[in-house]
Amino acid sequence: MYAKKFTGSDPQTVRTAAEIVALQRMKNRNDSDTDFSDDDEETSGGCPKMTPQEEQRMFEREQQIAFSGRCTIGDPESCHQLRTDINHRCGPRPSTSSNATWNILNRDVQRRNGPVMTSASRAHLLNTHLPNKKRRVDQLRTKNFCAQYIQNGRKMVVSSQGERENSFLSTKSGKIEISLPILSMQRTPCGPLQLVDLDTAVNQQGDLISYCTWKDAVYIGRMEQEDNQNITWFPIDWHGEHAVQNQCAVFCVRFSDDSEQIVCGTSEYSIHVFDVEQRRRIRTIVNAHEDDVNSVCFADYGSNLIYSAGDDGLVKVWDKRAWSDGDVIPVGVFAGHRDGVTYVDSRQDERYLLSNSKDQTIKVWDLRKFSCQGGVEATRACVQSQHWDYRWQPAPPGLCQPVQGDTSVMTLRGHSVLHTLVRAKFSPENTGRRFIYTGCARGEIVVYDIVTGTVSRRLKGHQAVVRECDWHPQENEIVSTSWDGVTTVWTWDERAEGVIAPYDHPNIHQFGDEDSCDELYQPIKKPQRKLRKPISARNAKCPTTSSEPDDFQI
């Protein structure tokens, strides 16, 4: 875990950071036989203590590590078709030059009284002005986990661990005009919990909230009032035909597009589908994966396909239409990661999806090209050969080596997946779904351009891992939540272009944390006026010219 950038870090953070520093020393001493298990005597007793100054320097050093980004094309044909679709949706590659920016803006102004801009022209304009400037909207003393825009971007929901081991949902509501920050804020306590919520989902209508916990429990809340102060929580009947005998963690929960069903993944390698109205389980897929199911989602607006991903390194596709015949085997499997998968997201076009993995890569998959059994076996062997824990150890070397039988369209590298289940997503429809954006263990948001295969934006502003970020469905605005307790909204500011340039950019320069925005300017203090001394004091110091000394002589 990267140490936080302040001297008041808790002792657990210091100890964890010290263990990370000791790992490389241990490897150098015994490179052929290194054991990082908890029962290792040298690991538990030989870690040096770090001072707050060393802790801060370590964090700054890790934060300055340059990631130029890299794209590997796995399927040239599918990649070409994907990029052609993007160019059709949003036009050619956006330019970042000032002349092109002003030309586009002038053209937009000239068309105000003319025909409405096409979706491709709008996407081209938005892609030229990607978010680059942060505004802090909330700060807590606990870790933030999830963030999601709802109701077409008029509201956002942020979930976090509570101050005293109680979880709560933070809902910020109010009209958004020209991507201005949300005006009001209410914090809504959750219902009955077991330890902490692991995932939070909100339907697109914004009237239903669901969260899951470390215990086999899923709750649904209905927001009945406009201010969201009173939420009625309903537990979902977890016991059914396949009752869970042991307590298990529910790592992920998602609503279907029609809000009639939710799907969950658990630590018992199973997938559960629930009916929202009846609040009961309607389908269980036992042993859906060979390890924890970290992520699930509905593939399309029809909600017939379900994607799932887990610590076995595989991404599986399930068709609900086949369940009526009792067939609960996946219709296809994607293999190619060298470690567990933390998140899966659909492009909502019934063709492409992505997966984020602990092997520090994002892979894009084509729904028409599943992996063969040889690729599945190769992935299984690679995952089983990993002996590191991403929660507190650095990523080992060798994760960049390709897996035989990998059928991914492309592989993106340039971000860090450590400490938690970091999430990656496709950008919304108003951008032509041109970009893939993800959180990062280095406190950043990394935005990849699918067409060029490069890092388009690297938004630095958090002091701890960014677990999830969400792109506004209508505006160029991204909300990010981090373990530093800060909720940040990113928008475009023409005066802050230097902040988001890649690390190796020749003209990179840095601004302050929150400068260059009008609403953040500090008022100029009027200089204090120098007080004049009284006449009597001045006369005492400097005698007047009218008085002559007694000994004056002509």
From Swiss-Prot:
Residue span of region Disordered: 24-52, 527-554
Record key words, sorted: Repeat, WD repeat
Pfam families listed in its UniProt record: WD40
UniProt similarity note: Belongs to the WD repeat LEC14B family.
Protein's UniProt name: DDB1- and CUL4-associated factor 11 homolog
GO cellular component: Cul4-RING E3 ubiquitin ligase complex
WD repeats: 245-284, 288-328, 336-375, 414-458, 461-500
Keyword Nucleotide-binding (UniProt): no
Ranges annotated as biased composition (Acidic residues): 33-43
Alphabetical GO biological process terms: determination of adult lifespan; proteasome-mediated ubiquitin-dependent protein catabolic process
Lineage: Eukaryota, Metazoa, Ecdysozoa, Nematoda, Chromadorea
Function: Involved in regulation of lifespan. Required for dopaminergic CEP neuron degeneration in response to Mn(2+).
Gene3D superfamilies reported for this sequence: YVTN repeat-like/Quinoprotein amine dehydrogenase
SUPFAM superfamilies referenced in this protein's UniProt entry, alphabetically: WD40 repeat-like
Keyword Repeat in annotation: yes
UniProt-listed InterPro entries: DCAF, DCAF11/LEC14B, WD40/YVTN_repeat-like_dom_sf, WD40_repeat_dom_sf, WD40_rpt
